[in-house]
């Protein structure tokens, strides 16, 4: 738990941060990407350093894709997964700089966002997370290209109606929310 309050790169923060807090850090999953994301944050040297470090690790300019696009590249899983992680890490870095006194009781994320939560909690390094998410995204992209498929949301209808729609189109209802 203590690692969450002073994770790298935040070792410069005060060590006497109260453990009791009701503030959680929640991180977004895939689908949160948009061209231009992070461009304003990159004006901060610490946030810019995260984008530059990711560029070096990945061997391509992820920062340029985030800041300038094209949208087609940013929506590919092998690009958007590390991109969303780096953007979320930059947001958290900026928040910690603006409000260093803020104590978090926990970190959580939706799917891909779990990796940002692990980083924020000090469980994985930035470098490890970028490498893992590049591989995760690449494997998922390859799987999508090998077996073209898709998903659709059916909202505000009874489960029976959703099942009828799915059956009529050769699909299966897979998730219920």
Regions found by a protein language model. Name each.
Residues 30-32, 58, 120-177:
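Alpha/beta catalytic cores of group-transfer enzymes, especially the acyltransferase/condensing modules
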Residues 21-108:
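Helix-rich "cap/lid" substructures immediately adjacent to catalytic or cofactor-binding pockets
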Residues 8-19:
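Short, Lys/Arg-enriched N-terminal segments with co-localized hydrophobic residues
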Residues 52-53, 86-90, 114, 127, ...:
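A broad detector of short, well-ordered amphipathic alpha-helices
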Residues 94, 98, 118-123:
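Alpha-helix C-terminal capping segments
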Residues 110-118:
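Glycine-rich nucleophile elbow surrounding the catalytic serine of serine-hydrolase chemistry
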């Amino acid at each position: 738990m203590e690692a969450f309050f002073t994770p790298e790169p935040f070792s410069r923060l005060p060590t006497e941060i109260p453990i009791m807090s009701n503030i959680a850090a929640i991180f977004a999953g895939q689908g949160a990407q948009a061209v231009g994301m992070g461009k304003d944050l990159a004006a901060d040297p610490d946030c810019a350093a995260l984008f530059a470090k990711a560029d070096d690790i990945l061997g391509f300019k992820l920062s340029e894709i985030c800041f300038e696009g094209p949208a087609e590249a940013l929506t590919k899983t092998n690009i958007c997964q590390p991109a969303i992680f780096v953007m979320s890490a930059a947001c958290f870095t900026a928040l910690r700089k603006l409000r260093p006194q803020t104590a978090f009781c926990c970190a959580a994320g939706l799917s891909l966002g779990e990796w940002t939560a692990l980083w924020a909690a000090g469980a994985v390094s930035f470098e490890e997370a970028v490498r893992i998410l590049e591989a995760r995204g690449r494997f998922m992209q390859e799987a999508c290209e090998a077996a073209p498929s898709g998903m659709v949301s059916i909202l505000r209808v009874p489960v029976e109606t959703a099942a009828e729609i799915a059956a009529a189109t050769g699909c299966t209802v897979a998730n219920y929310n």
